[in-house]
């Protein structure tokens, strides 16, 4: 079975955790033994060790021109190091800046205008990349569309991990469908993150016959993702993605708020979520759930992306194009179609086995 050749746009904390994870889990076999952090040891016959980075793009002068193994630990990245990564022989290349750097982030993302952007599609073709994984900052509307277009031009599948709506946008979905290239998106759900926990609790309350009156989810962190989202203009799509992901699980009108709420530098890549759900029980007796969740944000994301990569490769092998609905529904906050998580998981397993497309 051929390997999976991946390219990455945006070598930030999430990319760091993904690349570290490829090294950390490289000896995991086809065994069914539980491995912490993995939903599938083997997925469609593909192991973590089959995933090979072949190209990477960034705009920060501290990363451009360096080997990917070093760039993932360069500032402003601040996620935990859990694996040593050997030299990968993959040079980080300068991508197009476009709207990828918000005005308030110029001290955090350092652009050297003397470094010239490369032809991304040409690099993807030259390196024979199968899949382009998008990790650009939230709010990078034009930059994300640019990379999506480069994936199309190069004949790559596209995994969109941020809330710029590509897979869930009909025009873009049709472009990938017409090109017979798979896309999984939009906006990654973490393994055990705020959104998946919030969805699980709302699903349970609804199914048990209680009535949700209101619910909110507050999140703080200290990485560049949270710093970037202190600009309300960059935050719009993220709030839509998170709020709709939760609201879609409640089959009636209820007040729902979910979104990032501030950056505290000392937290680094630690994200702290506080969520509350007010609901009524038998006899309209009120009750509430008040919960705190603390996670290292980027490894939590990478645990899902390693499966999204393998599903995208299966879709490529089957010559499927357009949004892969079961994967998008299970892995992403803002898929083209919202599906109950338990149902989405069943459909995903059927897709992996090849019983549904």
PLM features: residue spans?
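NAD(P)-dependent Rossmann-like dehydrogenase/reductase catalytic/cofactor-binding core
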Residues: 303-357
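A short glycine/serine-rich beta->alpha loop
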Residues: 3-5, 184-187, 291-296
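Active-site-lining helix/loop region of Rossmann-like oxidoreductase modules
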Residues: 9, 49, 63, 71-77, ...
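Gly/Ser/Thr-rich loops at beta-strand to alpha-helix junctions
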Residues: 10-16, 137-142, 162-168, 189-195, ...
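Short catalytic-loop micro-motif centered on adjacent basic/acidic residues
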Residues: 132-134, 158-161, 184-187, 214-215
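Rossmann-fold NAD(P)-binding glycine/threonine-rich loop
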Residues: 137-153, 161-182
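Rossmann-fold dehydrogenase core element
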Residues: 175-188, 209, 213
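N-terminal glycine-/serine-/threonine-rich beta1-alpha1-beta2 phosphate-ribose binding loop
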Residues: 1-147, 229, 234-238, 282
